Amino acid sequence: MAQKQNKLTQTAIVALLACVCCILWGSAIPVIKTGYHLLQVDSSDTASQIVFAGIRFTLAGILVLIFASIKEKKVMLPDRTLLKYAIPVCLAQTVGQYFFFYIGVAHTSGVKGGIITGLGNFIAILLSCLVFRNERMTSQKIAGCVLGFAGVVVINLMGNSLDIGFKLIGEGFILIAQLSYGMSTVLINLFSKKVSPVVLSGTQFTMGGIVLTLIGIGMDGHLGNVTAGGLAIIFYLAMVSAVAYTLWSILLAWNDVSKVCLLYTSPSPRDGATS
């Protein structure tokens, strides 16, 4: 265990696994567009996009739990203790983050949405250092946050203009989504030291996915045309989420929030809302 711990805290290993997460999340973007096309989910249909995401995350959670069961050679079902930790993570990460983001992104520009989304990692660091006091705030971390966010702003402004308007249901909801993401990151960092990060990830995904699906259906969302190709897309995206978010949870279990967040881009739901 000590050897595993040492490897997972080495900066090179953290950076490598972070890159794997980024590649997986990046690969999801064009596949999601294809999935929307095959399943006849319109780019402006927020409710159906939430249903799409809910099904994807429910399946991702089930896949993670199956993998954990195979690895441990026993059925890994969440007990009462794990559920106590999984519920707040589920509400912050899968439900809160994605619900508010999908609605917010439909009511703001891509530039402002991208810039506000870029705040997620830095909110997580501030919460970890200043609210939960899991780690010390240092000048290096402050510099990393400032430079990182400046980079996000520059990238999103290249060739685009920015208006300064602010709407609660638009920019406000995206900001709430990033606060939810920051909170979930800190919670995973705390809880993964007490329970298996893999089972925690699988459980919160399954519960959160079911809740998102029900919310989307309640908003009159649906998949317009269920085909074999569309189901294959959902399965691939579920695999991406299962692998990437589980790696992310494992990294957070062994490292400070700031070390993980400053090494790679936030796993924002932007990929699921791109069309």
Spans of features found by a protein language model:
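Glycine-/small-residue-enriched transmembrane alpha-helix faces in small-molecule transporters
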Residues: 2-54, 164-190, 239
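Transmembrane alpha-helical segments that form core, pore/gating elements
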Residues: 22, 33, 61-64, 124-126, ...
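Juxtamembrane C-cap of transmembrane helices in multi-pass membrane transport proteins
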Residues: 24-45, 59, 98-108, 116, ...
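Hydrophobic/aromatic residues within transmembrane alpha-helices
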Residues: 35, 52, 104, 130-133, ...
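Transmembrane alpha-helices of multi-pass small-molecule transport proteins
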Residues: 38-93, 123-127, 180-184, 201-219
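Specific transmembrane alpha-helical segments of multi-pass solute transporters/efflux pumps
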Residues: 69-113, 117, 154, 237-257
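Loop-to-transmembrane alpha-helix entry segments
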Residues: 114-117, 133-154, 164-170, 227-231, ...
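Conserved small/polar residues in nucleotide/adenosyl-binding loops
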Residues: 264-269
